[in-house]
């Protein structure tokens, strides 16, 4: 497939087409035949950037010239696997400041779009690359997890739940060196600006190298290591910023250092194997280091080196690792940044400066990018399974019986809108589930709406969920508001001066227990019969 970009419905509807230079009936045609097409695509950018977006993109092999013939590890092994199943596209000549972010937004909001790697980025060394949309469809996600590509939604959720319940973490394996140590910058040689870090959204405060990243920290109090996905902005050659929302493990670690008047050691890893990246954004138990959990999932210990300046573990086959200290006594304006709620959720504000002490990187390094967009976008396409499994597990862990399924819906960024299905067992059961589901760890941070339904509802189908709400829930009787719940700076619905807490709407959309035997019977087949009919008679619709 040859990748080109064209404008189908100005000004914001972008598409991917198969033939470079052909006209596809769009209003402007492909940029290859109509150079002004790319101008319309970048109409929201400052005028001085528009000219930089006209570089011709062309397909290339995913391995740069002169690449090593050694067996691939880490992200590169994953790239080989995706290339083998036709899920990877590589293009050259796309500008990091003007166009990579736009193309990524298009990919995130196009069903079944490929993973795309950008190379020969204007102004940067050829071979220094950016990978986006890595886990943007179920086929790539299933392959990454070693599962059948046609696995069902709830089988995938159950797989994640088993991983959370049954996996025995494997301690990381310390090695002296690895691919990550092929190149090391220290002292005056440090230059973060050598990496082709994109401007992901037109109004971002600068380039953010940390989007599809894992940021490694350690608690000063108990030494527990955490790897979380937090945004990281590049200021200049030797300094950056790391924004961590209150309540997150990395922020709790930061507090232990700052409260002692000390800088926090940290490592920004911008190029992990996608499974490691997934783990960094999943609320696994706090006492389990993410790299050890991934090792348990894979059945093989993750090899790490020890950071020279921080002593923190760094995956030996990562692409880029930026080691340094988050200053407790020095701040600089960070942001704004387009966030997962679909808004520039906060203005620029002072945040601690991250002083870089060393940069480790592989030959021909790859930045893994997963910038937030208006949901649903790439992150939700994989987070919805792991977070749904975690939510169900935590409700059951609170001792609540009868929970048959949970779903952290992608339209709410897998945080704002959660649905739980239950088999009602006793009076008040559905209310109990709603209250607990609004406050467990998975749903606590920046939640908004919790809906509890009976187990005859397919909770992944919004039509069925809203049908249950509109036909089984009476607003006065079944809709309750919980106040004083944990929110954060990224909550767009909360006044800028009161971002710490928000309220939760809990909707009991179950049939009323008090007169369950008199509630009207629903028409239509059960979920099981419906699925059987689709499997048996799907050919009728071909």
Go through the PLM ranges and name each one:
Residues 3-7, 14, 19, 24, ...:
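Short hydrophobic targeting helices and cationic amphipathic motifs
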Residues 42-54, 58-353, 357-542:
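Extended, highly charged
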Residues 25-26, 38, 64:
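Compositionally biased, intrinsically disordered low-complexity segments enriched
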Residues 2, 11, 36, 52, ...:
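Charged/polar low-complexity intrinsically disordered segments
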Residues 8, 22, 32-33, 40-44, ...:
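Ala/Thr-enriched low-complexity intrinsically disordered regions
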Residues 1-3, 7-10, 37, 41, ...:
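Terminal low-complexity, poorly structured segments
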